[in-house]
């Protein structure tokens, strides 16, 4: 009988010199690309100004990355990053906080609504909320590959043992494993996919039958 799962996935897909190309970054990019295509299809269906969608992508990406990075730096290690502000720019070294990204998106959509669409923030969020679950699921799979954001210890057979000393392990040291823990990355990814499916259905219903603005955000 399986007692636990020993997770030894390498966070990096490959390296170019000293720079690693990581699964997390790939998952993040794929999530955004698929999300963009979903919103693009919604845009065409509703016959909206095509110039607005490219601006929405730019505002959303900037809000997500800047907010997530600042959230990590200021929420988790403010003393270090305030003393070394240039380190904040090193996004490629890792360190993104989802709650910071959420706040960044809200701020970005505020400016998008004021400067581009000239519609309410809820109108923009009504478009973004549909693929958000899918994007979030991809990011959580990236967290799984990074051996991070796992849950409490468990004796359930699907508990994961993650590598604690990733940097040393990458340099050739023997891996040091956590105790078997809940793979909360997978739990969250599954819940986000369910949320995505529900939002897709709600959008289809609201567009086909209700023709109402901001229906999803009101729900």
Question: What is each model feature region?
Answer:
Residues 219:
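Cytosolic catalytic cores of cyclic-nucleotide second-messenger enzymes
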């Amino acid at each position: 009988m399986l007692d636990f799962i020993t997770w030894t996935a390498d966070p990096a897909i490959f390296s170019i010199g000293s720079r690693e190309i990581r699964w997390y970054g790939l998952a993040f990019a794929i999530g955004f690309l698929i999300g963009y295509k979903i919103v693009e299809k919604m845009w065409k269906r509703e016959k909206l100004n095509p110039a607005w969608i490219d601006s929405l992508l730019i505002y959303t990406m900037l809000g997500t990355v800047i907010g997530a990075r600042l959230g990590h730096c200021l929420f988790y290690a403010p003393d270090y990053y305030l003393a070394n502000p240039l380190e904040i720019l090193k996004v490629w070294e890792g360190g993104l906080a989802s709650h910071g990204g959420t706040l960044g998106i809200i701020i970005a959509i505020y400016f998008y609504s004021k400067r581009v669409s000239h519609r309410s923030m809820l109108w923009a969020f009504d478009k973004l909320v549909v693929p958000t679950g899918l994007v979030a699921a991809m990011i959580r799979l990236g967290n799984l590959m990074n051996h991070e954001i796992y849950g409490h210890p468990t004796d359930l057979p699907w508990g994961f043992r993650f590598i604690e000393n990733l940097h040393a392990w990458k340099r050739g040291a023997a891996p040091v494993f956590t105790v078997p823990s809940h793979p909360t990355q997978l739990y969250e990814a599954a819940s986000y996919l369910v949320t995505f499916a529900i939002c897709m259905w709600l959008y289809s219903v609201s567009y086909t039958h209700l023709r109402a603005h901001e229906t999803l955000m009101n729900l």
